[in-house]
């Protein structure tokens, strides 16, 4: 391998530094119709929160209008948003779950 080839390879390797993936906040938004107990159930079921943490998060949703339920890679965040919104519709609640980049 010539010196030129080796130099070119080093430059290429430096440019290929891996960046960590973007992370996304999954957010539950307040509405005037979804029962508090249902929000707690969603938080426990989809975000693996215990009863106390789910209750605290639900109260944050209730009083502040929204709460972050977790921070995930894009694919996992999208999956959680779809799962929560689908589960809410299946149970005839308008609960809305969204995501935003951190």
From Swiss-Prot:
Gene Ontology biological-process entries? protein catabolic process; proteolysis
Q: Where is the composition biased (Basic and acidic residues)?
A: 1-18
- Region spans: Disordered: 1-21
* Alphabetized Pfam families for the sequence: ClpS
Q: Which Gene3D superfamilies match?
A: 3.30.1390.10
The UniProt function text for this chain reads: Involved in the modulation of the specificity of the ClpAP-mediated ATP-dependent protein degradation.
Q: Which NCBIfam families match?
A: PRK00033.1-2, PRK00033.1-3, PRK00033.1-5
Name the family: Belongs to the ClpS family.
Subunit structure, interactors included: Binds to the N-terminal domain of the chaperone ClpA.
The entry's protein name is ATP-dependent Clp protease adapter protein ClpS
What is the protein's species of origin? Answer: Idiomarina loihiensis (strain ATCC BAA-735 / DSM 15497 / L2-TR)
